[in-house]
Amino acid sequence: CGFDPGVTGVYTAYAAKHHFDEIQYLDIVDCNAGDHHKAFATNFNPEINIREITQRGKYYEDGEWKDTDPLSVHKPLNYPNVGPRESYLMYHEELESLTKNFPTIKRARFWMTFGQEYLTHLRVIQNIGMSRIDPVMYNGQEIVPIQFLKAVLPNPGDLGENYTGETSIGCRIRGIKDGKEQTYYVYNNCSHEAAYKETGAQGVSYTTGVPAMIGAKLFMQGVWKKPGVWNVEEFNPDPFMKELNEQGLPW
Protein backbone atom coordinates (compact mmCIF):
# COMPACT_ATOMS: atom_id res chain seq x y z
CA CYS A 1 0.00 0.00 0.00
CA GLY A 2 1.96 2.96 -1.32
CA PHE A 3 0.46 5.87 -3.21
CA ASP A 4 0.02 4.31 -6.64
CA PRO A 5 -0.89 1.56 -6.24
CA GLY A 6 -2.43 2.13 -2.84
CA VAL A 7 -3.94 5.56 -2.22
CA THR A 8 -5.25 5.71 -5.79
CA GLY A 9 -7.36 2.63 -5.07
CA VAL A 10 -8.71 4.23 -1.89
CA TYR A 11 -9.41 7.45 -3.81
CA THR A 12 -11.45 5.45 -6.34
CA ALA A 13 -13.39 3.65 -3.60
CA TYR A 14 -14.08 6.96 -1.86
CA ALA A 15 -15.36 8.49 -5.09
CA ALA A 16 -17.57 5.46 -5.74
CA LYS A 17 -19.00 5.63 -2.21
CA HIS A 18 -19.66 9.36 -1.99
CA HIS A 19 -19.75 10.89 -5.47
CA PHE A 20 -20.96 8.34 -8.02
CA ASP A 21 -23.65 5.77 -8.60
CA GLU A 22 -21.57 4.49 -11.52
CA ILE A 23 -17.90 5.15 -12.33
CA GLN A 24 -17.32 5.01 -16.08
CA TYR A 25 -13.94 6.60 -16.79
CA LEU A 26 -10.85 6.56 -14.58
CA ASP A 27 -7.53 8.28 -15.24
CA ILE A 28 -4.82 7.94 -12.60
CA VAL A 29 -2.33 10.79 -13.05
CA ASP A 30 1.14 10.88 -11.51
CA CYS A 31 3.34 13.96 -11.82
CA ASN A 32 6.71 14.49 -10.20
CA ALA A 33 7.43 18.17 -10.76
CA GLY A 34 10.53 18.02 -8.61
CA ASP A 35 14.20 18.53 -9.43
CA HIS A 36 16.86 16.43 -7.70
CA HIS A 37 19.68 18.32 -9.50
CA LYS A 38 21.24 15.13 -10.86
CA ALA A 39 21.94 14.45 -14.54
CA PHE A 40 19.96 11.20 -14.26
CA ALA A 41 18.49 9.39 -11.27
CA THR A 42 15.43 7.34 -10.45
CA ASN A 43 13.19 8.07 -7.47
CA PHE A 44 13.03 4.45 -6.33
CA ASN A 45 14.79 1.17 -7.15
CA PRO A 46 16.34 1.86 -10.59
CA GLU A 47 15.92 -1.74 -11.73
CA ILE A 48 12.17 -1.70 -11.07
CA ASN A 49 11.71 1.89 -12.27
CA ILE A 50 13.44 1.43 -15.64
CA ARG A 51 11.75 -1.90 -16.34
CA GLU A 52 8.36 -0.38 -15.50
CA ILE A 53 8.86 2.52 -17.90
CA THR A 54 10.32 0.54 -20.80
CA GLN A 55 7.64 -2.16 -20.86
CA ARG A 56 4.67 -1.92 -23.21
CA GLY A 57 1.81 0.35 -22.20
CA LYS A 58 -1.54 -1.17 -21.34
CA TYR A 59 -4.99 0.21 -20.56
CA TYR A 60 -8.55 -1.04 -20.17
CA GLU A 61 -11.34 -0.04 -22.54
CA ASP A 62 -14.77 -1.51 -23.32
CA GLY A 63 -14.14 -4.79 -21.54
CA GLU A 64 -10.70 -5.57 -22.95
CA TRP A 65 -7.05 -4.75 -22.40
CA LYS A 66 -5.25 -2.82 -25.11
CA ASP A 67 -1.48 -2.60 -25.59
CA THR A 68 0.64 0.30 -26.80
CA ASP A 69 4.30 0.70 -27.64
CA PRO A 70 6.29 2.01 -24.65
CA LEU A 71 5.60 5.72 -24.03
CA SER A 72 4.04 6.10 -27.49
CA VAL A 73 0.77 7.61 -26.20
CA HIS A 74 1.19 10.96 -24.49
CA LYS A 75 -0.46 14.33 -24.07
CA PRO A 76 -0.16 17.41 -21.86
CA LEU A 77 -2.20 17.28 -18.65
CA ASN A 78 -2.69 20.13 -16.23
CA TYR A 79 -1.68 19.45 -12.61
CA PRO A 80 -2.68 21.59 -9.61
CA ASN A 81 0.00 24.07 -8.53
CA VAL A 82 2.26 22.67 -11.26
CA GLY A 83 0.64 23.47 -14.61
CA PRO A 84 0.74 21.48 -17.86
CA ARG A 85 3.17 18.57 -18.06
CA GLU A 86 3.58 16.01 -20.84
CA SER A 87 2.08 12.78 -19.50
CA TYR A 88 2.69 9.28 -20.85
CA LEU A 89 0.31 6.34 -20.83
CA MET A 90 1.81 3.38 -18.97
CA TYR A 91 0.74 0.06 -17.52
CA HIS A 92 0.25 0.13 -13.76
CA GLU A 93 -0.96 -2.85 -11.78
CA GLU A 94 -3.77 -1.17 -9.84
CA LEU A 95 -5.78 -0.98 -13.07
CA GLU A 96 -6.18 -4.76 -12.89
CA SER A 97 -8.06 -4.81 -9.58
CA LEU A 98 -9.90 -1.50 -10.01
CA THR A 99 -11.55 -2.61 -13.24
CA LYS A 100 -12.54 -5.86 -11.55
CA ASN A 101 -13.90 -4.28 -8.37
CA PHE A 102 -15.70 -1.46 -10.19
CA PRO A 103 -17.16 -3.31 -13.20
CA THR A 104 -19.03 -0.25 -14.51
CA ILE A 105 -15.69 1.24 -15.59
CA LYS A 106 -15.59 1.61 -19.37
CA ARG A 107 -12.02 2.89 -19.58
CA ALA A 108 -9.15 3.00 -17.10
CA ARG A 109 -5.73 4.49 -17.81
CA PHE A 110 -2.56 5.44 -15.94
CA TRP A 111 -0.44 8.48 -16.84
CA MET A 112 2.99 9.56 -15.62
CA THR A 113 5.10 12.62 -16.41
CA PHE A 114 8.70 12.55 -17.67
CA GLY A 115 11.03 15.34 -18.75
CA GLN A 116 12.76 15.20 -22.12
CA GLU A 117 16.21 14.94 -20.53
CA TYR A 118 15.07 11.91 -18.54
CA LEU A 119 13.67 10.26 -21.67
CA THR A 120 16.88 10.96 -23.60
CA HIS A 121 18.94 9.23 -20.91
CA LEU A 122 16.46 6.36 -20.93
CA ARG A 123 16.78 5.92 -24.71
CA VAL A 124 20.58 5.86 -24.44
CA ILE A 125 20.41 3.28 -21.65
CA GLN A 126 18.21 1.09 -23.84
CA ASN A 127 20.27 1.62 -27.01
CA ILE A 128 23.55 0.58 -25.37
CA GLY A 129 21.97 -2.46 -23.74
CA MET A 130 22.15 -1.31 -20.12
CA SER A 131 18.45 -1.98 -19.53
CA ARG A 132 18.89 -5.68 -20.32
CA ILE A 133 17.83 -8.12 -17.62
CA ASP A 134 19.62 -11.17 -19.05
CA PRO A 135 23.14 -12.02 -17.80
CA VAL A 136 26.21 -11.19 -19.90
CA MET A 137 29.80 -12.33 -19.41
CA TYR A 138 32.29 -9.71 -18.18
CA ASN A 139 35.82 -10.51 -17.01
CA GLY A 140 34.91 -14.15 -16.61
CA GLN A 141 31.76 -13.65 -14.57
CA GLU A 142 28.10 -13.11 -15.27
CA ILE A 143 26.57 -9.71 -14.62
CA VAL A 144 23.10 -8.38 -15.36
CA PRO A 145 23.44 -4.98 -17.10
CA ILE A 146 20.52 -3.30 -15.35
CA GLN A 147 21.81 -4.47 -11.96
CA PHE A 148 25.23 -3.03 -12.76
CA LEU A 149 23.54 0.23 -13.80
CA LYS A 150 21.71 0.30 -10.46
CA ALA A 151 25.06 0.10 -8.67
CA VAL A 152 26.48 3.19 -10.41
CA LEU A 153 23.37 5.41 -10.40
CA PRO A 154 22.60 7.74 -7.46
CA ASN A 155 20.91 6.01 -4.54
CA PRO A 156 17.24 7.13 -4.50
CA GLY A 157 17.43 7.34 -0.72
CA ASP A 158 20.11 10.03 -0.96
CA LEU A 159 18.22 12.39 -3.29
CA GLY A 160 16.18 14.20 -0.65
CA GLU A 161 18.66 16.82 0.58
CA ASN A 162 18.71 18.89 -2.62
CA TYR A 163 15.29 17.94 -3.99
CA THR A 164 13.00 20.87 -4.80
CA GLY A 165 9.45 21.03 -6.16
CA GLU A 166 6.55 18.71 -5.51
CA THR A 167 4.61 15.65 -6.59
CA SER A 168 0.98 15.68 -7.69
CA ILE A 169 -0.85 12.35 -7.83
CA GLY A 170 -4.56 11.73 -8.12
CA CYS A 171 -7.59 10.22 -9.80
CA ARG A 172 -9.69 11.95 -12.45
CA ILE A 173 -13.04 10.23 -12.55
CA ARG A 174 -16.13 10.61 -14.70
CA GLY A 175 -19.43 8.81 -14.22
CA ILE A 176 -23.08 9.06 -13.25
CA LYS A 177 -24.66 10.44 -10.07
CA ASP A 178 -28.45 10.73 -9.71
CA GLY A 179 -28.86 10.23 -13.44
CA LYS A 180 -26.46 13.03 -14.38
CA GLU A 181 -22.91 12.94 -15.67
CA GLN A 182 -20.39 14.09 -13.08
CA THR A 183 -16.63 14.53 -12.84
CA TYR A 184 -14.49 14.33 -9.71
CA TYR A 185 -10.78 14.92 -9.23
CA VAL A 186 -9.15 13.88 -5.96
CA TYR A 187 -5.40 14.37 -5.51
CA ASN A 188 -2.49 15.15 -3.21
CA ASN A 189 0.46 17.46 -3.76
CA CYS A 190 3.54 16.70 -1.67
CA SER A 191 6.53 19.04 -1.30
CA HIS A 192 9.95 17.39 -1.55
CA GLU A 193 11.44 20.04 0.74
CA ALA A 194 8.76 19.56 3.40
CA ALA A 195 9.13 15.77 3.22
CA TYR A 196 12.89 16.04 3.69
CA LYS A 197 12.54 18.49 6.58
CA GLU A 198 10.18 16.10 8.39
CA THR A 199 11.74 12.73 7.61
CA GLY A 200 15.05 13.13 5.77
CA ALA A 201 13.49 11.53 2.68
CA GLN A 202 12.28 12.96 -0.64
CA GLY A 203 8.61 13.27 -1.56
CA VAL A 204 8.33 10.04 -3.55
CA SER A 205 9.54 8.06 -0.55
CA TYR A 206 7.22 10.04 1.73
CA THR A 207 4.14 9.41 -0.42
CA THR A 208 5.02 5.71 -0.47
CA GLY A 209 5.80 5.25 3.22
CA VAL A 210 2.98 7.21 4.85
CA PRO A 211 0.16 5.22 3.15
CA ALA A 212 1.88 1.95 4.07
CA MET A 213 1.93 3.09 7.69
CA ILE A 214 -1.76 4.05 7.54
CA GLY A 215 -2.70 0.68 6.06
CA ALA A 216 -0.73 -1.14 8.76
CA LYS A 217 -2.33 1.02 11.45
CA LEU A 218 -5.87 0.28 10.25
CA PHE A 219 -5.04 -3.42 10.04
CA MET A 220 -3.63 -3.53 13.57
CA GLN A 221 -6.64 -1.63 14.91
CA GLY A 222 -8.97 -4.14 13.25
CA VAL A 223 -10.57 -1.41 11.13
CA TRP A 224 -9.30 -2.98 7.90
CA LYS A 225 -9.39 -6.65 8.74
CA LYS A 226 -11.41 -9.56 7.39
CA PRO A 227 -10.60 -13.14 6.34
CA GLY A 228 -9.01 -13.61 2.94
CA VAL A 229 -6.91 -11.48 0.60
CA TRP A 230 -8.23 -8.04 -0.35
CA ASN A 231 -7.19 -4.98 -2.27
CA VAL A 232 -7.33 -1.61 -0.55
CA GLU A 233 -10.33 -0.45 -2.59
CA GLU A 234 -12.39 -3.31 -1.11
CA PHE A 235 -12.30 -1.78 2.38
CA ASN A 236 -14.20 1.22 3.74
CA PRO A 237 -12.20 4.18 2.38
CA ASP A 238 -13.34 6.73 4.96
CA PRO A 239 -10.94 5.85 7.84
CA PHE A 240 -7.99 5.83 5.43
CA MET A 241 -8.97 9.17 3.88
CA LYS A 242 -9.26 10.67 7.36
CA GLU A 243 -5.79 9.42 8.25
CA LEU A 244 -4.30 10.88 5.06
CA ASN A 245 -5.37 14.35 6.18
CA GLU A 246 -3.91 13.78 9.64
CA GLN A 247 -0.64 12.12 8.61
CA GLY A 248 0.75 14.65 6.15
CA LEU A 249 -0.89 13.77 2.82
CA PRO A 250 -4.00 15.99 2.66
CA TRP A 251 -6.33 15.70 -0.30
Where are these regions (language model features)?
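C-terminal catalytic/substrate-binding lobe primarily of soluble NAD(P)-dependent oxidoreductases
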Residues: K17-W251
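Conserved A3 ("GATE") glycine/threonine-rich loop of ANL adenylate-forming enzymes
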Residues: F3-P5, A33
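Active-site-proximal alpha-helical scaffold in enzymes
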Residues: G6-H19
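Rossmann-fold dehydrogenase core element
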Residues: C1-G2, I23
